[in-house]
């Protein structure tokens, strides 16, 4: 419903959900069949089309299917989460940093993330006690977003603590906003996670482009 089937969701398109029948609902006709061929394309506002579609199908429990995903979540904890939060190498991970931030803020801060690997980790592990507390550039993926957005968040909610989590690459793109912070005396905290690369771009080049690294 309303998705672009971009590579952050699908991974390699030539291997994505080959066994699945896809019903794709989207208000923009240009998105339908653009990246993935749909079995049933539905063009229109999902506020109208989704109720019309669900009225035609019977409710199912999908117990076995859901249990399979519960099993995958256990694997994710063992293979990904435990290694990020309790690494054996001794080198601090981004997950550990975000967990430490949770302890300091008690989930009460507004967390603004830039775009990159740190964004994925922050959105996975950051804890929030209130709504409207997680600000990120999720759709457009604009590097350099966090610092100016954090300034705006502090002006919008001056009574709340605002923390910007930024990668070393994204920080270089709008670091001139430090001048704005000093001029306007904006109390924004910055947490810079340096992975020494444009990490997510490099990761995609590693996974999908035979490690042909360029401009990372």
Functional labels for PLM-detected ranges:
Residues 4, 90-95, 170-173:
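Active-site glycine- and acidic-residue-rich loops that bind
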Residues 9-13, 100, 177-180:
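A short acidic, amphipathic alpha-helical/loop segment
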Residues 1-69:
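Glycine-rich, acidic loop regions that bind phosphate or pyrophosphate groups
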Residues 73-154:
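Active-site diphosphate/adenylate-binding microenvironment
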Residues 2-6, 116-118, 169, 195-196:
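Short glycine-rich anion-binding loops that position phosphate/pyrophosphate groups of nucleotides
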Residues 24, 112, 165-166:
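Generic enzyme active-site microenvironment
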Residues 16, 32-43, 47-53, 121-216:
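Thiamine diphosphate
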């Amino acid at each position: 419903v309303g998705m672009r089937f971009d590579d952050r969701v699908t991974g390699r398109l030539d291997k994505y959900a080959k066994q699945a029948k896809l019903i794709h609902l989207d208000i923009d006709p240009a998105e339908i069949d653009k990246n993935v061929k749909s079995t049933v394309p539905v063009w229109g506002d999902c506020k109208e089309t989704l109720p019309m579609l669900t009225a035609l199908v019977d409710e199912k429990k999908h117990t076995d299917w859901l249990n399979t995903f519960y099993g995958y979540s256990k694997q994710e904890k063992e293979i990904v989460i435990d290694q990020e939060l309790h690494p054996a190498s001794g080198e601090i991970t981004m997950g550990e940093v975000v967990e430490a931030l949770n302890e300091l803020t008690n989930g009460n801060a507004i967390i603004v993330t830039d775009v990159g690997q740190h964004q994925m980790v922050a959105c996975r592990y950051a804890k929030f006690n209130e709504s409207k507390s997680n600000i990120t550039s999720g759709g457009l993926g604009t590097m350099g977003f966090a610092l100016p957005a954090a300034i705006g968040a502090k002006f919008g909610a001056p009574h709340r603590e605002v923390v910007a989590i930024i990668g070393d690459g994204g920080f270089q793109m709008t670091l001139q906003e430090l001048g704005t912070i000093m001029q306007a005396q904006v109390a924004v905290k910055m947490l810079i996670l340096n992975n020494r690369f444009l990490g997510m771009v490099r990761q995609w080049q590693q996974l999908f482009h035979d490690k042909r690294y360029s401009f990372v």
